[in-house]
UniProtKB/Swiss-Prot annotation:
It holds the Pfam family BEN. Keywords: Isopeptide bond, Phosphoprotein, Ubl conjugation. Residues 287-392 form the BEN domain. Residues 78-88 have a biased composition (Basic and acidic residues). Residues 99-111, 121-153 have a biased composition (Polar residues). The gene is BEND7. This is BEN domain-containing protein 7. The keyword Glycosyltransferase does not apply. The modification Phosphothreonine is found at residue 324.
Amino acid sequence: MEFSERKRSRKSQSFKLVSRDYHHEVYKIPEFSNDVNGEAKETQPIFLGDESMEIKKQITGMRRLLNDSTGRIYQRVGKEGEKLKEEPQDLDLVWPPRLNSSAEAPQSLHPSSRGVWNELPPQSGQFSGQYGTRSRTFQSQPHPTTSSNGELPVVNSSAGSNCCTCNCQSTLQAILQELKTMRKLMQIQAVGTQNRQQPPISLICSQRTAVSRKRNKKKKVPPKTVEPLTVKQKPSGSEMEKKSVVASELSALQAAEHTSPEESRVLGFGIVLESPSSDPEVQLAEGFDVFMPKSQLDSILSNYTRSGSLLFRKLVCAFFDDKTLANSLPNGKRKRGLNDNRKGLDQNIVGAIKVFTEKYCTANHVDKLPGPRDWVQILQDQIKLARRRLKRGSEIADSDERLDGIALPPTVV
């Protein structure tokens, strides 16, 4: 194939020109071509012949252009998942042999053109259009001549009307004019369908503003809380007195409510004993003769209830001082060494603290409740800390004694 010869590829979207030495009679229509917009424009023919034959060739080219457009739409708008139909091979459009113009008289322009138009609808993929340049912007729905199931009607390529076989120029020109108007209508419909697919900008803006309004409405404070503040009247003296009495009663009730949970905490897990002193004592657990001042227990419960292990540590420190912890063992047993004078901690006190901590943590949903093996470990940690504190205290005391032992030199007067 020479460089000047260009044929149409099966998969490409472009149409290629064919050199003029291509000897097929059907495709040799050099006087018809398309511009960029797909409009048919007439060029000067290479050879001078009958004018009616030239119009027939133009009609043939326009028919191929329209059939190619509709066929392309039908192939691209197939259902998803279905294999698109292949383009059939181009069929030869050969006009029937000319008859004598004197054999039939030319009919009127309008009826003849309408009759021919009904018999020459655009076909679906019958002619792929060698002479048309496909416009990439032309993508629309099938032409209204399609049937209900989406397929275009197929019409025989040969024209059945006698008027098409004759050489009446007025009829042929009318057919060509209607084909051109058909092309324009298809382009207008393509632009309309593209505009329908894109929503207008005003609609998008209105939807966005509606969404923003909904979000603002959610953030607004309900008006019920604002109404009593805005509607207020100046109360009289009697109303003020009534309000003061009601406020005092409410404050007393609130104070009772605040004190009752604290008392319930202690009463539920400890027994309060009446004593002549102002500060009553609380028995931590039943069956254990372990008592603690109520004020001290309340302060521990209000400050150290983040975890059960921390509460247990603070209660142990409240019952045992550093010297007792430093000279004790956590499990209550005596060390067997010769010079080891450590004794076990009082298991009565440790047991009461343990029972109180378990009940309090389970009732108030306190996290980090010590496990069965954690109690002894916590006691060992407290013993080590007490020893460190005593050691630091002894070192500080020794340093203070050394400073006191250094006497200032006497001054001679």
